[in-house]
Amino acid sequence: MNIIFNFINQNIKMVENKMREIEIEKMVLHCGGTEDKHDKSVQLLKMISGGKIQSIQSTKRIPAFGISPGKKSGCKITLRDKEKIMDLLERFFVTLDNELSEKKITENQFCFGIHEYIEIPGLDYDRDIGILGFEVMVVFKRKGKRVKFKKAKRGSIPGRQNVTKEEIKKFLESKLDLEIVEKHGN
C-alpha cells in the first residue's frame, strides 16, 4: 500500500487553482471640472484612451465650487481591453518613476493620480487643453465574479473571493516591475 501512495505522490504535481488567479477587470480614467474645464477634460481623456467619454452630472448644490444640480461636473471612461490597460499602465507608471505608494492600494483595487498629462510618454502639450491632470483606478477580480451580477440564478460571493492588498502588490511587482513604497506623506 505504501508503494502505491509513494508512486502517486511522486507523479502528481501541485497545480494552482485557476479560480484563485487574479486579473484586471477594468480601468477607469476620471477627470473633474465644471464648464470650460469639463470640455478640456473630455478632450484629454479622448486623447489618452481614444474611446467614448461619459459625462458626470452633479446631483447636489455646492455653491463654493460653483456646482448646481444637473450641471456637468466631470467625465470618465471605463476601459476593459486588457492589452490596452497594460499598455496605458506602463506609460502611466513611467511618470511615477515606477513606484506606487502602499496607501493607494486597497482591497480589489488601486488608485493614483497623474498631475500633468504632458509627463506621459507619447503625449505632447495641446494648447486647447492646457495643463490638466486626471485620476486612474484599476479594479481586480477573480474568476466567478459573474455569479454576483448575472440576471438568472444570481448568487453571492464569499469574502475570500476578494483580491487582497498583498495579492495586488505581488501582481504589480511581477507583471509591471513596479516598486511598492511605504510613504508617510501623500
Task: Give residue spans per PLM region.
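Ribosome-associated RNA-binding proteins
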Residues: 4-186
